[in-house]
């Protein structure tokens, strides 16, 4: 009779974390991002501490994005082709996002994408860590993670909504004296990258859904003519700003 091979022994949590050092580093930085984001959204330590947590959340997200970009493109090259390839990666988009907003006036809308992306991505690795503890360990946390996974599509749409409406928010910040002159232009560049993202089409999809919804609303007979004309002109202007060839 042929010898049957026994399955390899399951790694404990410490051995599992140490055997996947890069993934573990990203997991820890994402958890830190989630913690700092919550401390900013719920400023229990006061407004000054909340502003510090805002910067820490964005810096931690920048670290996570840089590690993820290195994982996706491990061989760095100082060339135009490598830069073009890097700009197609979602991790590069959110590295730029964090650097754009880290020194800006802290607003809740700008922290939600960082918070929710970190939460979603940390969920997958947290499940693996729980599996290393045992199949039935910490069922409360497992059930919570399952609910997050089940609502992933709605969360991604909410993130895309924040990405879109942060564009007019940067313009408002400029005129209110809370933003720099370059912020709207730099953020517009980020938004075009999100619009053309290959792995995350939610920004592009939400733009289309908002346009259809607004056109349906202004075409109703009860809508004033001047408001209809203003909305249609705004839609045409935004459509001209959208990247082509997507």
Language-model-detected regions and their locations in the chain:
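Multipass alpha-helical transmembrane domains of eukaryotic endomembrane proteins
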Residues: 3, 8-246
